[in-house]
Each structure stands twice: as structure tokens, then as C-alpha cells.
Amino acid sequence: MKRQFEIVSAYSPQGDQPVAIEKLVEGINSGKKKQVLLGATGTGKTFTISNVIKEVQKPTLVMAHNKTLAGQLYSELKDFFPNNAVEYFVSYYDYYQPEAYVPQTDTFIEKDAQINDEIDKLRHSATSALFERDDVIIVASVSCIYGLGSPEEYRELVVSLRVGMEKDRNQLLRELVDVQYGRNDIDFKRGTFRVRGDVVEIFPASLDEHCIRIEFFGDEIDRIREVNALTGEVLAERDHVAIFPASHFVTREEKMKVAIENIEKELEERLKELNDNGKLLEAQRIEQRTRYDLEMMREMGFCSGIENYSRHLTLRPAGATPYTLLDYFPEDFLIVMDESHVSVPQVRAMYNGDQARKQVLVDHGFRLPSALDNRPLTFDEFEEKTNQVIYVSATPGPYELEQSPEVIEQIIRPTGLLDPPIDIRPIEGQIDDLLGEIQDRIAKNERVLITTLTKKMSEDLTDYLKDVGIKVNYLHSEVKTLERIEIIRDLRLGKFDVLVGINLLREGLDIPEVSLVAILDADKEGFLRSERSLIQTIGRAARNENGRVIMYADRITRSMGIAIEETQRRRSIQEAYNEEYGITPKTIQKGVRDVIRATTAAEEPETYEATPAKKMTKKEREKTIAKMEAEMKEAAKALDFERAAELRDLLLELKAEG
């Protein structure tokens, strides 16, 4: 359906936004493949990108480097485009422990996953929207380059129903089962259907409250209605409805037969290879596991871990590029890579990490070699599948700059705020000097961020400041999400005035009350003192009209020189603009929100075993379970499979005793 993108906003582009929009649109219309938008912190990059989408009218994929950032972008874009399809596509695992084998201890860890039903619904909503309309924006995490089923199969297996169409009721039921819908007359939920005489109700995989009621008269569809699944209230009459498959890995029966033959062939070859090499245990293992999966596929049409056979199911040759979300888009689409200095390296790294784990499973007989083809795209494959890309970052990386030497800049903030001035002061006597600066800020009811290089220095500095009566807190890597949000909130509310940390570049640290950022050991070259990190850190003081940065250093390194020069260049552009238009910089006014939803902090393992489960109260048990689940997710994320499996077993015991 041809619908136009339209922005709903009380604001119009300001500052250098109109020029950036014009240049980006011009580049896209003239066929430029890659462009870079260098947008300083707080300049309204999302609003600029929204205007570009509105002007070029192309389906757009916005990629972010984590779920938190993707969630923020999704909310913002949904506000700008309330009448268009803004969709969300991230990994649907709340907790995902991939199957893994640890040869040293002969430990096989089964895949264990907890799927978030809401996110699964949003993923189906995203893919079906791409086949139903043109005005689609999908906000995705980098996991969108992971393998997905074939878009051709997904499109061809759509069950299309129209009023007046001749169709036998039982034929419709068979078609629904073929696209992985289950009949359930009692527990009616997403991905199921129920039958009452001549009425069939279908709960599409992409909806969460509405279902479709099909009323038959003989062998003809008499009426199609959209109904509230809970109350039965009729919401709308429909002439036509398209029911998309309930799984992205759907395969027609004839293809499934060919796939099963090919899997059997591969199994025979692999068994011969393993037996010839004297790997009898591995041969027995792979035969047992694969034959069980094949039996399930013959009987049920699917099996647990069916994605590992995706190469056979889509009849692709070995080593072929897998299908991903990118294949569901039409040919002429736009990709926006947000925070590209992080997301581009992330796309590069995905493939190698995945292959390393799967290779161990293949070598030890847990998976057939074809499982290696259920994988994310390599960087070159990703490049081939992209049409036109806009890289967005305050500090674009070397790859983006090499791809698009002409950078489009967005330096001016709608609030008139300037990049902060930078002082360089000697390391000797830095703490006493810093103490004086902190006291000045406290007197004005402003806040201070201090970044150090080591955990020890952070702890020592925090202790020292506490001893001299400063209200201070320390943000380190062990602080989990929920605590972190609370710490930032308390800093904004003035429960303490100074926040010390090592890496202050993570999201959520744009705090308008902060007027001083102090960088200790600024002259020690390295990851957190590279020019990009320094520019991003300096940006933390750009939300306050009195913002200032102090670098404590005995020499000016190359990175410091570049960061200082770039900040001064941006500041002079901003000052000239403010002078020309008579703008007075004003600190951003941003309400302090309560913590809405996040993960509880997880404690060290020994604290779990300190209180025997039998002696715990119900509340204590629930609290411990929540903490352990959080740590289990963290362990799986950090690829610490043994720890995750150990926690999973502890959890099962706890739940059983509850």
C-alpha cells in the first residue's frame, strides 16, 4: 500500500539541521551509496534523520548497537511518525544460553532460552509490515544480521483470505497448520486458531489483542471481522486479510522432504569421516541427535534448534550467504547506522564469535557441519546487501570516513549550548586543585563527573573525597543496570554532587546538571583516552551553559591535540551562529524520571548459598531468584557458559523448593 511518511512535530528544523537534511537528501537522490552525518551531542540527530526519511520516502532500517539504544530510538521515531509503521526488531531472547561444549571438562551445555513474547510479536509485526506497506521504519539491534528464514517462503506461504472467496473450512485449517499455527480452542493466544462450527478465529503472530474471525457459509467466506480477543467486541469489518506465518523458519512440505534427504546424506558423509578418524564417540553422538531431529521434522514439521538446519531448509549450497532481515526489505531501501563508531566494529565482530563456538560443537559431534551456515553475515556480505547507508556519530570511525570522505556536519544545538572550554592543568597537585573546583560547583548547585583510568584510582579518589566531606558516588563496571539508573537519578536530584567512574561513555550519562568534567591522566594514550573517547567525554559537559572540561596532563598527546582542536572548532562555529541570531545558551531543562524497568543487580555467587533455601522467606526467595536470573543472563552474555549453567541449576532447585 502506497502511504507517505509524514512527520508530526511542533518543531521545524533549526540551526544547521536544514543544511544537513538538504545535503543528505541530495546525496541519496543522486545515488550516493554512503554518507556520514557528524552530529555533535545534543544537536537533534534523530530529528534530522526523520526529516531525511520524510523527504526521500524510502523504507528505512535504523541500526543501533544495543537494545537500550534501539528502544530509545524506537520511542523517538514513533513520536515523529505516528501515522506510519515504525517497528522494532531485536533479539527476542530475554535470556539466551547458546548450546556450547567445553572440551576441557567434557561438559555439553544444552541451548536454554527464554523468549520474550512481546518482542517476538514485534518481530513478526516488522516483517509482515514490510510485505504490506511502503512507509516502514524498522529500528533494529545489530542482531538483525543473524540468519532468518527465506523471505520468499515467508511471502508465498501467506494465507490470503477475501470475502466471497470459495474455500473449504478444513482446507483453511490445513493451511494454517502448514504455516505453524496450532489449534487451541481453550488457551487462545498469538500463533493459534480456534474453531466453533462455521466460525474460525485466528490470532495472528503479529498482534497481541486483536484476532481475525472468519465466518463461512458453506464453502464460501461470508464475512471477515477484526475482533478483540478478550472481550469478543467487533472492531472492524474487513474485505481482505493476510495471515503471515507464525514462524520465520517456515518450509513447504515438498521442500521439507528434499531437506530431510539432504540432511541424511550429510549425516552419512559425516559419520564416515568421524569413524575413519577413530572418533567413535562423536559419531555415535551426531547420529543419535540428528536422527531424533529428523524424526521430529517428519512428524511435526519442525524440531528444537531447527535453525541449525536452515541451509538445508532453504536449499542453499554450503557457505552460501544466509537470509536475514535485510532480505525482507525491497531493493531500494535506506540504512541508518546510529553511533556508527561502535555499531560498524560490532557488525565486523559478529561472524567470528559465532563461528568459534559452533566449530567446537561440530568437531565434537553435537552438530553437523551445515550448522556453521546458520550464522550472522560477514562484514563483506553485509556490505553487499546494503543499498544506501547514512553513518551517524559524534565521532565517526576510520572506516566511515574512508567510505565517505565528505562529512556532513551538524554542530549547532537548537538550545544554543556551546561545546565546553577546555583547561589543561599539571598532574602535580591535581587532587587539591580538583577539590577547589568541586566546591565551586557545589556552591552553585551544579554537578561534577570525574573520569579516572584505573579501578584503584577511582576507589582511592572516592574515599578521599568522602573523607573531606564531599557527597560522592562511584560508578564501576560491576554496577548493574538498575543501580546505574538510580545512581544517575540521585546525582541529578542532588543526593550527591560528584560521580567518579572509569568509562563515562555509556548511554544515559547526558546529565544537564553537570557543569564540570574532570579527566585525570588525560595524557595516557589508550582506549579511554583516544581522540574519539575524549571528544565523547568532553560532550558530557555540553548540556550546561556553564559547562567546562579540565584535563590533568603533563604533556599534550596527539589524541588530546585532535580532541581539543575539534572542540574549539565546533565551539567557534556555535558562537558565531549564536551571535548572528542573538541566541543566549540555556541549560537543557529535563525532568528527572523515576526508574521504570530494569534488571536487578546480581551479587557474587557465594551470597546465594549463604542462606539455605529452606530457611528463606517467600520474599527473600523471590528476590534471590530475580538476582540469579539477572546474573545468569550476564554470564551468558559474557560467554561464561559454565557459570550460566550452574546458575540455571541453582535456580531450578530454588524454584522447586518454593
Curated annotation (Swiss-Prot):
It is found in: Cytoplasm. ATP binds at residues 39-46. SUPFAM superfamilies: C-terminal UvrC-binding domain of UvrB, P-loop containing nucleoside triphosphate hydrolases. A motif (Beta-hairpin) lies at residues 92-115. InterPro entries: Helicase/UvrB_N (IPR006935), Helicase_ATP-bd (IPR014001), Helicase_C-like (IPR001650), P-loop_NTPase (IPR027417), UVR_dom (IPR001943), UVR_dom_sf (IPR036876), UvrB (IPR004807), UvrB_inter (IPR041471). One of its GO terms (molecular function) is excinuclease ABC activity. The UvrABC repair system catalyzes the recognition and processing of DNA lesions. A damage recognition complex composed of 2 UvrA and 2 UvrB subunits scans DNA for abnormalities. Upon binding of the UvrA(2)B(2) complex to a putative damaged site, the DNA wraps around one UvrB monomer. DNA wrap is dependent on ATP binding by UvrB and probably causes local melting of the DNA helix, facilitating insertion of UvrB beta-hairpin between the DNA strands. Then UvrB probes one DNA strand for the presence of a lesion. Forms a heterotetramer with UvrA during the search for lesions. Interacts with UvrC in an incision complex. NCBIfam families: PRK05298.1 (NF003673), uvrb (TIGR00631). PANTHER family: UVRABC SYSTEM PROTEIN B (PTHR24029:SF0). Belongs to the UvrB family. This is UvrABC system protein B.
